[in-house]
Regions:
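Walker A/P-loop NTP-binding motif of AAA+ ATPase domains
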Residues: 45-224
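C-terminal alpha-helical "lid" subdomain
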Residues: 2-45, 193, 205-282
Length: 282
């Protein structure tokens, strides 16, 4: 079944409720319609996630269709993406939005946390209300600041912040996706509220090979080059994009397979040094 097309029919603002109901009741009768495909520029296959990326998309699609059929039952989809910085969490959120024909409303901690007492809580409530009114997927990006375990809170506002987020998330009937690099500091009650929790891990060999080909297509990398990069177990898609951007400013005669491999390895060494410096443990 072409879920992408089906969901566009359900959410279309040009269709009446009776037309939408017909699509729900007869989801396989799509042959007479023009079917559109989603943006294919984002390659899900390179991601290393605890749940396969395409399966995540299908889970969301299934929930939307089933929610439309079941009146009065649980509504809303709550998703948590956690793991390494630059591992594709935000990009997958955009892909999901594209897959179901909806837009993202993106929020981050800097835009939510306020200086005045109660301001942050109001901003959280406002974000959920805005997503509801605009019928968008709500993405809270890197929101470690208000996911913190309440038992460790040193200020009362930290507790009320988590409480407000829990309240708003539970009553929200749309899709909310949250991303964090630090799941280990998250409030336990917060974690239990998510329907889908996905860990984003370092790239495997095949992911490294695929991204080398995508970002540096004119170079011929050896299997040893690929193994050198992936053995650190910290390489992410963001590393390749960052290095590709930097190479614009270089004399291209100096850019070789060896240089690219060395630079990517240096990035991983810097990550490892950073973890040791601030006392992180695996």
């Amino acid at each position: 079944m072409n879920y992408q097309y089906l969901l566009r029919q359900i959410y279309s603002t040009e269709k009446s409720e009776s037309q939408k109901t017909a699509v729900i009741e007869n989801p396989y009768d799509l042959d007479s319609h023009e079917q559109k495909s989603i943006n294919s520029s984002y390659d899900l296959s390179v991601l290393n996630t605890s749940i396969p990326a395409q399966e995540i998309v299908e889970m969301v699609q299934n929930a939307i269709v089933n929610d439309r059929k079941s009146q009065g039952k649980e509504k809303g989809i709550r998703i948590l993406f956690y793991g390494l910085s630059g591992s594709g969490k935000t990009n997958l959120a955009h892909y999901i939005a594209d897959a179901i024909g909806k837009k993202l409303l993106c929020k981050n901690a800097s835009g939510i946390l306020g200086m005045l007492v109660g301001e942050s809580e109001k901003n959280i409530a406002k974000a959920f209300e805005e997503a509801k009114e605009q019928k968008k997927i709500l993405l809270f990006d890197e929101v470690d600041s208000f996911f913190r375990e309440r038992s460790y809170a040193s200020q009362s506002w930290e507790i009320t912040l988590v409480n407000e987020f829990l309240t708003q998330m539970e009553k929200f009937e749309g899709i909310v996706i949250c991303t964090t690099n630090l799941r280990n500091i998250m409030d336990k009650a917060m974690q239990r509220r998510f329907h889908i929790m996905v860990e984003f891990k370092a790239l495997k060999d095949e992911g490294v090979e695929s991204l080398l080909g995508k970002y540096f297509p004119h170079f011929d990398f050896s299997e040893e080059d690929i193994r050198r990069i992936s053995r650190f177990q910290s390489a992410t898609p963001g590393d390749f994009g960052n290095l590709s951007s930097r190479l614009r400013f270089m004399n291209q005669e100096k850019v070789t397979e060896t240089y690219i491999t060395e630079e990517l390895c240096k990035m991983q060494e810097e990550k490892e040094f950073g973890k040791r410096s601030i006392g992180f443990r695996d």
